[in-house]
């Protein structure tokens, strides 16, 4: 293999640039040319492809976002769109593709593989919801962003003796809510993977208030429901002054943490190695701090699950 491509797709995550840098430099080190595909699968269909040199990925390891840009592309879900993408890859002489992104990005890589074009998926999403890896690129940075917000909100919650509901990202996965809630000492954590009883949530808040606790932090993953609705219900049921903060897209931005930079560097390099070994249709990950790779179709067939021990611990510590 003498020429490979790299693209980022779906929602951006801090550390994607570090992964791009790793792919480019690892490949060039082994005498392989690298072409960047701009604007994800939409750019692939449009032929928005440019050769990348070592200098093109200099001074980006510390930057959030993605220098290749990203976009969602419904057209690529069609057979016609996939064929257009493959035509562009062949037109540019690209023999293998590294796809950095989440579940939808992996689906695209799987389709290309089924059409006979070798792809390797690299998990890049703040949601940490990709099977086959303990951590995804961007999760640690997003987690630290949320924890920083929790710490600041707790200061004002304490000063004004208020209850605060903080809504975080996670439509289908509660990792951000669970990990940030545990690290931030939240009194209640609500995640999509676990049922909850609103009456129980309110009763726990009242019990805490009765023993002298005048402020509380509640973390709600967006997939559970609207933080604004939860705040309204809590204030109406308890009479406690309640405020709501929806963190939104601030969770996707910022300079990646050291952990995410190292993780991205390791995973990006391993993706290149797999392509050079002739192993397409794979996705890379990290488990027990060891690099692993899986069949991408099998990984997609599995469902991400929450760490039940951590969830149980969060409930034990939030009495």
UniProtKB/Swiss-Prot annotation:
Binding annotation for ADP: 21-25, 59, 154, 185-187, 211, 213-215
Regulation: Allosterically activated by ADP and other diphosphonucleosides, and allosterically inhibited by phosphoenolpyruvate.
InterPro entries according to UniProt: ATP_PFK (IPR022953), ATP_PFK_prok-type (IPR012003), PFKA_ATP_prok (IPR012828), Phosphofructokinase_CS (IPR015912), Phosphofructokinase_dom (IPR000023), PKF_sf (IPR035966)
Pathway entry: Carbohydrate degradation; glycolysis; D-glyceraldehyde 3-phosphate and glycerone phosphate from D-glucose: step 3/4
Molecular functions per Gene Ontology: 6-phosphofructokinase activity; AMP binding; ATP binding; fructose-6-phosphate binding; identical protein binding; metal ion binding; monosaccharide binding
Disulphide bridges: none
Sequence positions that bind Mg(2+): 103
Protein name per Swiss-Prot or TrEMBL: ATP-dependent 6-phosphofructokinase
